[in-house]
Amino acid sequence: MRPLSLKGHERALTRVRFNREGDLTFSCAKDKKPCVWYTENGERIGSYDGHNGAVWDIDVSWDTSKCVTASGDLTVKIWDAELGSCIYTINHQTPMKSCGFSYSGNLVCYTTQKMTKNLSTVQVRDLRDGNQMAEGAESFFSTQFDVNATTALFSQMDDIITIGFESGLLQQYDLRNPDSPINTNEVVHRYSIQDLQLSPRGDFLISASRDKTAALLDVNDLKKLKQYKSERPVNSACIAPNRDHICLGGGEDAMQVTQTAVSAGHFEAKIYHMVFEEEFARFKGHFGPINTMAWHPSGSIIATGGEDGYVRIQEFDEDYLGFTYDF
């Protein structure tokens, strides 16, 4: 492993993502400046300035023309990815927790937190419709929940949205018939779902939870196919684009880190075989729990972001690339 350690954030990382080609890495943290980097050499290209609170999530459109950020300053912002200028700002009464583009890049979804009299909501807006993007405008899809929605993403083209909740519940809504969820899974996780990621081919979802497990799910019906067990809460999980492997990241909760030996904290990223559910490799690097991770489209790089404020770009060596699993 030849890691690049990128220092551009003052506080804990909340999300790292690659664009579709993998030449750019996008990151955001609990400081107020999302950053974009060259994946090849770790050089920082710049930051997106405009938020006034922790940035919880970032996503980039398929053509890398736009990116979207969700922040604790009660706004979601749509940016010109190349110029760094803010195109739209969406305001709400409570903090925004997650956001994402649809397959086409024309729709954006985001989740808001439950606070005082305001329920948690998931909303979708169409960037092509100027009326929806105007200040104070209504979104074309909005649904409310009594429990916090922690993460949401488009799981099938521009039609179906998958939502993960603080209670461990998973639900899917079809935007063409949005009155009630089309699929629900209440038993896959016992505690909060920290992360949901789609496989590169779009046929699987992987969920990471505080109940110390990650689950591989069928994207069509949310049926649990495989489960991967860890010794500590799992904050993020991702699927390899060209191998039957998945990677988990997490570790001892950040609040308890000072009472934990580094070896006992399980701050390593762990690689499992997707089918056999067996861990066969792990790599160290972060001093503290891993909060977010993403697998590069080439399959030869993993980016991780930790509570220590660093983004680490880990490039696999021949031991991994030439590895074949013994049946």
Swiss-Prot record:
Question: What is the annotated localization of this protein?
Answer: Cytoplasm
**WD repeat residue intervals:** 8-49, 51-89, 188-227, 229-268, 285-324
A Pfam family matched in the record? EIF3I
Query: What do the Gene Ontology cellular component annotations say?
Result: eukaryotic 43S preinitiation complex; eukaryotic 48S preinitiation complex; eukaryotic translation initiation factor 3 complex, eIF3m
Gene Ontology biological process terms in this record: cytoplasmic translational initiation; formation of cytoplasmic translation initiation complex
Q: GO MF terms on file?
A: RNA binding; translation initiation factor activity
Give the PROSITE patterns listed for this entry. Answer: WD_REPEATS_1, WD_REPEATS_2, WD_REPEATS_REGION
Q: Which residues form the signal peptide?
A: none
Q: Does the entry annotate any disulfide bonds, and if so which pairs?
A: none
Question: What InterPro entries does this protein's entry cite?
Answer: eIF3i, WD40/YVTN_repeat-like_dom_sf, WD40_repeat_dom_sf, WD40_rpt
Q: What keywords is this UniProt entry annotated with? A: Cytoplasm, Initiation factor, Protein biosynthesis, Repeat, WD repeat
Annotated family: Belongs to the eIF-3 subunit I family.
Q: Which PANTHER family match?
A: EUKARYOTIC TRANSLATION INITIATION FACTOR 3 SUBUNIT I
Oligomeric state and interaction partners are given as: Component of the eukaryotic translation initiation factor 3 (eIF-3) complex.
> What exactly does this protein do?
Component of the eukaryotic translation initiation factor 3 (eIF-3) complex, which is involved in protein synthesis of a specialized repertoire of mRNAs and, together with other initiation factors, stimulates binding of mRNA and methionyl-tRNAi to the 40S ribosome. The eIF-3 complex specifically targets and initiates translation of a subset of mRNAs involved in cell proliferation.
- Specify the protein name: Eukaryotic translation initiation factor 3 subunit I
Gene label: eif-3.I
